[in-house]
């Protein structure tokens, strides 16, 4: 591939994150009725009063994952967790030297790891720990495994589950990450002739086939039924969509915005103007949108607001050179 798919995906994720930060936690009606109206581009402010172009925990944890992958030339679960600790404790992978907007499940897992140094037990396993904190950071692992021609699909899914499980170790969260990987894989292996909806459907079908081979997955699969048929999901009215921090809401809203729009810009603006967990849903959608439309589809004025853009570009270039 001539383009840098790492940059396509990661910059899509980071721009989506930064676009959503200023309106995070707001209801759709609150956003629309602001003095400035709906989101049209990068803004400052928000719950954490950050400068325009600031990425949050989504971008930081994705960058931490990518940094570990580049440095180790593979997925090293222990090192990924160490990178998360550097983010939490030292503010690494942030633009201003301090982590913010940390999710409860991620924080709990990180401090459990700091105490016990055990990657097998640090992740949260209860059903109430199915937020979107592993889905938001899984993209670098997905790209790496989509490029891997040697590892079996079963082992790839296990790796994705293990990366999720560092913080979110319930099957529902791991399955969401597995379906996200399947969509990334479909995007990177499409011939470019099919629609985005059809490519994502191909990926979802592949993921569902994998999970359908084990009856122990059947109950959890029922939570993903809206993704089974994207033609039907595309017909869903916005009032019937939810865009909160629950992993099911996040992946549904991200895919819905992708298949009901025709550009990266339109997709991300649609996401953030839905309200609620705007930064994370936009990061999840942005990663896929970036892979489909390419980094050149991101408005230049949006990119211009991202401080430390060069750091992201350099890290993605290192990844590109390692996996040509």
What are these regions (language model features)?
Residues 1-324:
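Structured, active/binding-site neighborhoods that engage oxygen-rich ligands
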């Amino acid at each position: 591939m001539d383009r840098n798919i790492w940059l396509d995906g990661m910059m899509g994720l980071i721009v989506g994150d930064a676009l959503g930060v200023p309106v995070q936690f707001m209801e759709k009606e609150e956003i629309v009725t602001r003095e400035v109206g709906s989101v049209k581009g990068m803004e400052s402010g928000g719950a954490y009063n950050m400068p325009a172009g600031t990425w949050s925990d989504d971008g930081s944890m994705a960058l931490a994952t990518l940094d570990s992958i580049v440095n180790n030339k593979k997925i090293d679960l222990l090192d990924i967790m160490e990178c998360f600790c550097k983010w939490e404790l030292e503010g690494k992978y942030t633009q201003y030297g301090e982590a913010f907007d940390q999710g409860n499940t991620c924080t709990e897992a990180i401090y459990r790891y700091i105490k016990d140094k055990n990657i097998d037990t640090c992740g949260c396993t209860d059903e109430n720990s199915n937020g979107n904190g592993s889905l938001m950071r899984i993209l670098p692992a997905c790209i790496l495994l989509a490029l891997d021609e040697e590892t079996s699909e079963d082992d790839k899914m296990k790796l994705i589950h293990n990366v999720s499980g560092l913080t979110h170790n319930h099957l529902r969260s791991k399955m969401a990450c597995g379906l996200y990987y399947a969509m990334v894989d479909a995007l990177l292996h499409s011939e470019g002739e099919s629609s985005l909806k059809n490519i994502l459907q191909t990926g979802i079908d592949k993921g569902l086939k994998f999970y359908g081979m084990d009856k122990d997955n059947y109950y959890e699969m029922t939570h993903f039924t809206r993704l089974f048929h994207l033609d039907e999901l595309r017909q869903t009215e916005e009032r019937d969509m939810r865009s909160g921090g629950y992993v099911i809401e996040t992946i549904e809203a991200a895919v819905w915005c992708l298949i009901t729009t025709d550009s990266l810009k339109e997709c991300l603006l649609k996401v953030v103007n839905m309200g609620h967990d705007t930064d994370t849903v936009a990061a999840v959608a942005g990663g896929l949108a970036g892979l489909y439309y390419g980094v050149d589809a991101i408005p230049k004025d949006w990119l211009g607001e991202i401080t430390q853009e060069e750091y992201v570009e350099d890290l993605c270039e290192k990844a590109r050179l390692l996996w040509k």
